[in-house]
Every structure is written in C-alpha cells, then in structure tokens.
Regions:
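Short, hinge-like loop/turn segments at secondary-structure boundaries
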Residues: 31-33, 129, 158-162
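Catalytic cores of alpha/beta
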Residues: 55-61, 119-137
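Flexible glycine/acidic-rich beta-alpha junction loops that bind and position SAM and/or redox cofactors
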Residues: 24-25, 81-86, 116-124, 136-175
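Conserved SAM/AdoMet-binding glycine-rich loop
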Residues: 1-111, 116-118
C-alpha cells in the first residue's frame, strides 16, 4: 500500500494514529520501508508519543532525507495535574529531550500540540505549558481547543468541570 503512494508521487501521506510508535517493530518496519523506497517527493506525517521513542528509532529517522517524514507530538499540557486528570501518561522532560535530539539532525519537521480548556488548566498554567513547549523549539507549535466528544471521559465529567461547549460538531469548549 505504501508503494502505491510512492509510485504515484503523492505529496503527503498522513498516519493519524497518535500511538503509531507504541508498536516498536511495526514503526521500525514502516520507517525502514519508506527510507529504502524514498522517491524524493512524498512526505510521511506521523502522530506519535515522543516519550516512548527508542534510541534505534531516533537513529533511523535521524538518517532520513530532510522532508521525508514529519512528526506531530500531542503534548496537550505540561501541567501534571491536567495530564493525570485526562488519563495521559507523558514525561515532558523526556519529550523535550527527544524533540531536541531530533531537532539536532535538521531533517525532520516537528510540531507539538497544546489544547486549551483542559481540566485544571488556567491561564497561568496554559502560559507555562506554552513556554515549556516553545523552549524546545519545534518548527510549529499548534494550539487547539478542547472538544467534548459524545461518550468521551470529558463529556461524562462536564458537570464536574462546569464545561460549556457547542452542541454541534466540532463540540469545542466555549468556557
């Protein structure tokens, strides 16, 4: 399937599973394949958890053609109370170290995501999250707003957090 995109010189292919690299062998297999079959045009976009990247993964991607891949890393927040409350596991210090290591190769575009409106996140802690992410110098810092999806944990907790959000897609938090 990847070869089809390469043969047809598709400009960009996105892997939108934010846990793409949680299966180490699978990620390595795909990255090796696209490196070996690089057509010089197609860019592959991966959403991943940076803090679980292993050294051999970093070494492999650091040796790729500039522009062959780009990484989207969903930080969401660096406020530990927020991260705990939304049931995420993330070591931001490790994320920052890995993003910095990858940046040193000057071949991989990285963008890190933050979300406004999360539990226990106020203006000051959001500013701190912004500063923390800004300091690691990703090529792009993407800001999004919390969306309260039907059936999600946040929808079940909406009264506890006093969430007011749009009742039509994309269900963004208003306040």
């Amino acid at each position: 399937e990847l070869q089809f995109f390469l043969d047809h010189k598709v400009p960009q292919v996105k892997f939108v599973d934010r846990t793409f690299n949680c299966r180490h062998d699978h990620a390595m297999e795909i990255w090796r394949y696209i490196k070996e079959h690089d057509n010089g045009i197609t860019n592959f976009h991966f959403e991943l958890a940076a803090d679980v990247l292993k050294d051999d993964e970093i070494e492999l991607i650091s040796d790729m053609r500039p522009g062959l891949i780009q990484l989207e890393i969903g930080v969401q927040s660096t406020n530990i109370d927020t991260i705990t409350e939304i049931h995420r596991k993330m070591d931001f210090k490790k994320v920052a170290d890995i993003v910095t290591r990858i940046n040193a190769g000057h071949n991989i575009h990285q963008h890190l995501d933050l979300i406004a409106g999360l539990p226990y996140e106020d203006l000051e802690s959001f500013k701190q999250s912004f500063q923390d992410v800004y300091e690691v110098r990703p090529e792009q810092l993407q800001l999004g707003f919390l969306k309260v999806l039907k059936g999600s944990y946040m929808e079940k907790q909406k009264e506890n957090y006093g969430l007011v959000y749009k009742d039509t897609p994309p269900y963004e938090v208003l306040y």
